Amino acid sequence: MTHDNKLQVEAIKCGTVIDHIPAQVGFKLLSLFKLTETDQRITIGLNLPSGEMGRKDLIKIENTFLTDEQVNQLALYAPQATVNRIDNYDVVGKSRPSLPERINNVLVCPNSNCISHAEPVSSSFAVKKRANDIALKCKYCEKEFSHNVVLAN
């Protein structure tokens, strides 16, 4: 909220609000998670001021709720995100993503020789937490990559 307590992005009556997305990550989430493949209204706030983060992105999707799996898959991109369930303009549920064991149907394998590029299969990566990194192992070629390599793909 601004100092005069006005919302910078209009409130929604029912749906999902993904808040505290790192700045410049909102559009990537929209495309990777196919959040725009709906006829419901989507409101996007980019580079909004944030006391905690300096700047943040925000996504509001009316009449749509994320599954627990979708919420947890956000952890790679927005580990500090808050996912709010809204009903009748009130927050009725709040969750934070936690790193899942697998990420399916979202990422693309960076190995150009991987069979997932030539065959009609859904992507699938095992998530492995390392000391200072997160590694992703492709189900098909079994190669392991730093999450930054896969995310840049």
From Swiss-Prot:
Cofactors, names only: Zn(2+)
Keyword annotations: Metal-binding, Pyrimidine biosynthesis, Zinc
Name of the featured protein: Aspartate carbamoyltransferase regulatory chain
Positions contributing to Zn(2+) binding: 109, 114, 138, 141
Cellular component per GO, a single term: aspartate carbamoyltransferase complex
GO terms under biological process: 'de novo' pyrimidine nucleobase biosynthetic process; pyrimidine nucleotide biosynthetic process
Gene3D superfamilies membership: Aspartate carbamoyltransferase regulatory subunit, C-terminal domain, Aspartate carbamoyltransferase regulatory subunit, N-terminal domain
Assembly mode: Heterododecamer (2C3:3R2) of six catalytic PyrB chains organized as two trimers (C3), and six regulatory PyrI chains organized as three dimers (R2).
Alphabetized SUPFAM superfamilies for the sequence: Aspartate carbamoyltransferase, Regulatory-chain, C-terminal domain, Aspartate carbamoyltransferase, Regulatory-chain, N-terminal domain
GO molecular function, one term: metal ion binding
Pfam (any one): PyrI_C
PANTHER family hit by this protein: ASPARTATE CARBAMOYLTRANSFERASE REGULATORY CHAIN (PTHR35805:SF1)
UniProt organism field: Salmonella typhi
Function of the molecule: Involved in allosteric regulation of aspartate carbamoyltransferase.
